[in-house]
């Protein structure tokens, strides 16, 4: 067997997330169906570095899979790209070592979250931004977001029901700015891993702080208390993008 690593992008609007689910349309299912056709009915399982939720988009999701025989990478990329649905793009494919694993190999993930703060909202971007029509103080959010940088137990920012025991993660970058062209707010988070709905919960909390409903110190209170009830709401996922995954070496 020969192992391949692929970088893919997708519009998450019509997907029920990345991971295969029974009777639902997912990114994993669509790619595996295409690989099945390309490999003469041989079942191919793909593994994803991140399990994006329903409606969440990706510019730089990474997957890996094993094929029975070695193939020329550009021909493989072209075939997979042209035969998957139009809301999936296969950006790059490369051959990797047999022990490479896209999820467990040490890496840095970057997520981006777009918020349409306009009144009225931009209807053309309703699937690609999350609308928040209330007054926001960006300076308060910029001050608060700095408290997320570093190594912390993010229990207070994860969704209930997660099976992950160790909730300590390291965030190396956390910023919020306003895009001058679109006027959207852009939240950016880079780190060694993120818990279930962590980014959406962090953005929901920062918006409450920007709106004056929570103090700037609330981020530190949530981290120290590990109490999900003290954080903001889980904001809808249509503004969330898996931007990039960078592997060591």
From Swiss-Prot:
Family (UniProt): Belongs to the tRNA pseudouridine synthase TruA family.
Disulphide bonds in the chain: none
The protein's name: tRNA pseudouridine synthase A
Gene: truA
EC top class, as a word: isomerase
Domain of life: Bacteria
GO molecular function: RNA binding; tRNA pseudouridine(38-40) synthase activity
InterPro entries tied to this protein: PsdUridine_synth_cat_dom_sf, PsdUridine_synth_TruA, PsdUridine_synth_TruA_a/b_dom, PsdUridine_synth_TruA_C, TruA/RsuA/RluB/E/F_N
SUPFAM superfamilies for this protein: Pseudouridine synthase
GO biological process, one term: tRNA pseudouridine synthesis
Active site per UniProt: 53
Function, in words: Formation of pseudouridine at positions 38, 39 and 40 in the anticodon stem and loop of transfer RNAs.
Keywords in alphabetical order: Isomerase, tRNA processing
Known EC number: 5.4.99.12
Stored Gene3D superfamilies: Pseudouridine synthase I, catalytic domain, C-terminal subdomain, Pseudouridine synthase I, catalytic domain, N-terminal subdomain
Subunit structure and binding partners: Homodimer.
Binding positions for substrate per the UniProt entry: 111
Catalytic activity of the protein: uridine(38/39/40) in tRNA = pseudouridine(38/39/40) in tRNA
Gene source species: Streptococcus pyogenes serotype M1
